[in-house]
Amino acid sequence: NDISDNEKKEIQKRWVFSFDEKNSINLTEEELLWIKNNPIIKIGADANWPPFEYVDSSGNYQGIASEYLNLITKYTGLQFEVNADNWYTTISKTKNKELDMLACVAKTADREEYLDFTLPFLSIDVVVIAKKELQIKNFDEIKNYKVAVQKGNFVYENLIKKYPNIEFIFATSNKEAFELVSYGKADVFIGNMPVFSYFVEKEMLTNLEIKFKADFEKIDLSMAVLKGKETLFNIIQKVMPEIIEDEKEKINKKW
């Protein structure tokens, strides 16, 4: 069903939002029609990965990624139905094509087989976290320790290739991984600075510290769309540079 000129104008008036007329998003007729016919997008999220994304005690989706989704809604009119769960379940649902996209995800070779990644909105350092008394000098030494990892996490995918004999202790969330180390059930956790700061402050895990940066490049966080959904990907990819330029600093300061 084609879109009439009047309908097109109405959709643009209602949905094509811009902070500044100069920066309005030029969506094609095909993209506008796609939005009209697919207004609600099923998006997968990690329920416990603050400050990037999490579900608060009232059941609301919060965090840096949620701010970007709200802005995509303002720019395009797309609405997001958030399916938040532990990360392993979220990744599995995405692979099974139960979800349209992910809100906040690191690119890996495995994920590139079934996802198209947008422009990154954040780069983060990966760090090695352990109890204060643990003497660990360099990244290569982690092969001698029990390493807490979140199932399905990019860190696990990287480590298993480099150190296939590491003893992994699996956690369903970052919070659980920090607790495993804090309570002595695992020796180290490889995570990132913002998540560590958030949990140490909130959960009072004062016996943990960052030992050093992990032997990884910085991790880029992006949104990712299921392969085969080219129009949705093109819309998100078109909007992200505008949002990043206008709002990135404000969002990062807030979180």
Whereabouts are the PLM-identified features?
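Extended ligand-binding regions for polar small-molecule ligands
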Residues: N1-E29, S66-Y75, K132-Y156, I160, ...
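Membrane-proximal, cysteine-centered motifs at transmembrane boundaries in secretory-pathway
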Residues: F170, K175-L180, S197-Y198, D220-V225
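Extracytoplasmic small-molecule ligand-binding "clamshell" domains
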Residues: E7-E10, R14, I25-E113, Y163-E179, ...
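Hydrophobic/proline-rich hinge and linker segments of small-molecule sensing/allosteric domains
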Residues: K42-A47, L115-N138, K151, M223-K227
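A ligand-binding cleft/hinge motif common to bilobed small-molecule-binding domains
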Residues: Y88-K95, A103-Y114, N158-K161, E179-E217
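Short glycine-centered helix-capping/turn motifs at secondary-structure transition points
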Residues: I3-N6, G59, T94-K97, G184, ...
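Short beta-strand->loop
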Residues: L33, L115-S123, V127, I169, ...
